[in-house]
């Protein structure tokens, strides 16, 4: 395995031509991400071989993550929906967040127990103003949805510690 120092010398572009790549995730030996301009979820390997894994119809896929059973989740922020890809490739609504906020939902992270955290910001600020207030919701494995944090300025990255006890939010 190369050291970080030697790996940095080997940095290279593995894919060009994206409209707007977002929500990078490593899954099953490939880098997956959303391409906002096309509505596609793309996976690319270290050699640059890419594959469109899913095209989300009529929505902008903001971010992705996987349930512990391997099913893909997609946050469609403008629509206020979390979609789930079934084994046959179909998309179904996993959670509807529209009743919680009229503002777009953004980032997603799933912990090892199947709890799903989704954050959303407030309305886009006017020039010179700040983002917020936003919120974080928890979608439990039983499907229930509840807000777990509010007054978040602009959460754009989350992680859960390996023991599933702490949600870390980049604000």
Language-model-detected regions and their locations in the chain:
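Sequence-structural signature of mature extracellular/luminal beta-sheet repeat domains
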Residues: 1-171
């Amino acid at each position: 395995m190369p050291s970080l120092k030697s790996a940095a010398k080997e940095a290279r572009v593995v894919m060009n031509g994206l409209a707007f790549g977002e929500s990078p995730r490593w899954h099953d030996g490939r880098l997956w991400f959303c391409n906002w301009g096309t509505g596609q979820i793309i996976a690319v390997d270290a050699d640059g071989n890419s594959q469109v894994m899913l095209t989300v119809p009529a929505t902008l896929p903001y971010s992705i993550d996987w349930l512990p059973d391997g099913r893909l989740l997609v946050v469609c922020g403008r629509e206020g929906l979390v979609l789930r890809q079934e084994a046959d490739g179909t998309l179904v609504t996993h959670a509807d967040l529209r009743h919680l906020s009229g503002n777009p939902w953004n980032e997603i992270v799933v912990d090892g127990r199947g709890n799903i955290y989704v954050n959303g910001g407030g309305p886009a600020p006017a020039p010179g103003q700040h983002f917020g207030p936003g919120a974080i919701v928890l979608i439990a494995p039983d499907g229930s949805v509840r807000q777990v944090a509010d007054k978040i300025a602009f959460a754009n990255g989350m992680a859960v510690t390996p023991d599933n006890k702490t949600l870390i939010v980049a604000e």
